[in-house]
């Protein structure tokens, strides 16, 4: 039996501002944007040409979900953006105003830095060794 993770839900405040951040600042591709009803859309994004695992931008619909925006993992890094050229992507993201929470560092597993999205969700930018 073949199985894989198809999408990971990321709670956002607004579909359009989230799409803009991810496509303009992180150079993600908008895979799908389908209106389901007056308030809900099916919005999938992914880095470049990656489509096997996508991020589902899910607009918060309840006060409980709104509280989780930017903190779905209780302050820990939530998502890991792997790159084949750390310094290229780090400088490109920095020039576009992405907020980095630390200086890049070398770890036994690779070069890494923590950054935040527009809502405070923590990500690792990571080039594995």
Which residues does each predicted region cover?
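Vicinal oxygen chelate
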Residues: 1-7, 29-82, 90-118, 126-129
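Conserved beta-strand-loop-alpha-helix junction that forms the acyl-donor binding cleft
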Residues: 12-15, 36-38
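Helix N-cap motif at beta-to-alpha junctions
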Residues: 14-15, 84-87
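Conserved active-site tyrosine of GNAT-family acetyltransferases
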Residues: 18-23, 93, 120
